[in-house]
Amino acid sequence: YNRIEKMRPFSTHGVAKMMHQLAHVSDAVAHPWYAKWNVHRFLRPEAFGGLVHLKKTGQRDYPLHDSIFDSNVLEKLLETSPHGTYLLSTITKIGSPTHPSYPSGHAHCAGACVTVLKVWLDPHGTRCWPGYIVEANGSGLKLQNFTGPEFEGEPIPNDEKENCLTVTGELNKLAHNVAMGRDFSGVHWRMDGVSGIRQGEEVAMNYIQNELDRQPECATRKFKSFDGEFVYLTKAGCSQDALDIM
């Protein structure tokens, strides 16, 4: 696949395989749902806020930690509440989903899909993001070139800087935004997203490993994990320096 100029992978190591893997690992949400219902049964922030409100107002005596009630955040909640409660607000009118909080299904799926993309698009973790990096302007209505301080005010070019923004780095941000964006709406805890991303990564690793073991040729997959460490996946019985398709 990588030694003959006029030959490119298709069904086994081509784009079709990448799309196939993305579709399959998207089903990773089955794993967090088992953990949500059968293991942790962890309260949503909104529901936990209900416990705090009932104890703070003397209606119940739940065994909640004293540090919660020593914090000034409760008074801030009371000041901003239109109904004079200590409940945690959510962005959505319907409130939190009715299934348990931990781990986040969105984060799980994001971690799995982003891991597959890193394996295919930036296995070495050093590929510069193609083209110029853009960001929102002050009003948030238009895009402008991003100029990091290390580039002395110049737009970041394609592949001309050693310290460019990498494909892996941007994909990590994508997974983080999907996971932590749920926190912004008030329906998840931070730990739901952090753990969900890592669990999704494990799902993708196991799936890719199973695929490698089923194919006839030796091949290696590698990527930089969310921890920043390189992970190597190799067909059983093959050396780590086996044919690197990427």
What is each stretch, according to the model?
Residues 1-246:
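Hydrophobic alpha-helical bundle signature of multipass membrane enzymes
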